[in-house]
Amino acid sequence: MILKKIKILRNKFKQYDIDGYIIPKNDEYFSEYAKNDRLKNISNFSGSAGIAIILKKNNYLFVDGRYTIQAHQESVENFKIIEIHKKLPHNIIKNCNLGYDPKLFTSKNLKNYFLNNNLISINDNLIDQIFKFKEKKTKPFYSLEKRVVGETHQSKISKISSFLSSNNADYLFVSAPENVAWLLNIRGYDNPNSPIPNARLIIDKNKNLFLITQKNNVKKIIKERKINKNQIIDIKDISKLINKLKGRNFIIDNKTCSIFYENIIKLKFKILDKDDPIYKLKSIKNSYEINHMIEAHKKDGLALTRFIYWIKNINKKIITEVYAQNKLEKFRKLSKDYLYPSFNTIAGAGSNGAIVHYRATAKTTKKINAKDILLVDSGGQYNYGTTDVTRTICFSSQKQSIKNIYTNVLKGHIAVALTNLSKDDTGKKIDIRARKFLKKKNLDYAHGTGHGVGFFLNVHEGPQSISKYNTIEIKKGMILSNEPGYYKKNHFGIRIENLIYVKQLKNKLFFENFTLAPIEKDLINYKLLNKIEKNYLFKYHLNIYSEYSASLNKNQRKWLASLI
């Protein structure tokens, strides 16, 4: 079927005078979890990041290090798989006329990837012409009260107004829907794993705003936010709006503003390319948001604790990866505040655990055997909070070599958790701490140690992260994941992940755990742990027991007490 679709796509090349066509993973909102997954439809690759290039004779799929194994397993056989950090598209594809949809690319990433090629903008997406995606009806947006988010939308808008004035700008184009959600304190139902409403926004220095979205989505919030109906702009009318606006300087963020919108704006205004200030404002959570996240993680941790006990005590009953992830979902649903997963659960047994972002399906699901190591990475959206946690679980005695690797991953995890932060610490500096024990054994992992996390928004959020290249200063109120790992192709995967936040007492900054879920002790070589690390584990499991013992049955309590 896919090969037939590729043939149909190639038949369109002559009409548009192109040698190839570029298909990214993201949709026009640059969502990580795109509803219309064009990349999967043309390549069968289901990972959350990647770019396909279909040429007249060759097909290429560029992915990052998390997805190399998965891409080889999933993609149709005539795709050449390239790791994008090793070779950019322009290193392989040169002097070609390449077609692209300007709504799906920013000028920055297009130029970086496709130097030495002639890029041809095609407004009518060629994949959409072939697959005919159906538009799904969505529910109206809804508002969050100040008691939930801790700050009114008026206060946030004032901060943006001040930013515009200080940068001698008339307007800011907020192209990222999650930033619109944060600014207006609204949420929606447009995305499968995040309460982000599909909307964009233009705001001027006088605090006037124009919300760009489907008009039927905003009937509720028009009254609640006292927005004039004339300030609601249908997506197709963006050009008319820009022509009516007066002024000179327009700020866009070319990391998130598509070429399509950039081209419309620059016809009339001088473009000022600056980072959207909302990213940094949104990254620092206030006490209301932190407290709601703590409560969400308490509920999530109880589900995880029950799940881990259950799966370690199923008495030789053979289950599949899909069965396990469905069972975890049932435990989460016991909380009335649980809404849905914050991303597709990863439950990888044995060799599947080595696929960093593996997803078990009815076709790929594997039986979990007693000798397997099971990697479970999952998360939830709650009223109100976002969770993400990974545990590596075993069911029988493992080789000493595997225990040693697991313990070195754990030592890196603890090293991050116990970091005493200075004011100029960055994710790059902290990443070194996480990897150092593995690197002593010439081992490493091909992903960052941690990503930022949103408050009842995206589970992956910037600009902060713990990675080799991130130079953003870590500040009070930031939320990050702490997830070092190791993956042996065709054998096993190990990852230990907690969500952490930056806390301040007097002049000291340090990380505090959100996540409360038992860490697998049967994989630890205690001879490799020092007193500080052992004490960390003792206190961590004691905290879990104190929090959940009253909610567990006798057998669960006994098991949990044995971990202390």
What is the meaning of each model-derived region?
Residues 1-564:
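Active-site neighborhoods and metal-handling regions in enzymes and metal-associated proteins
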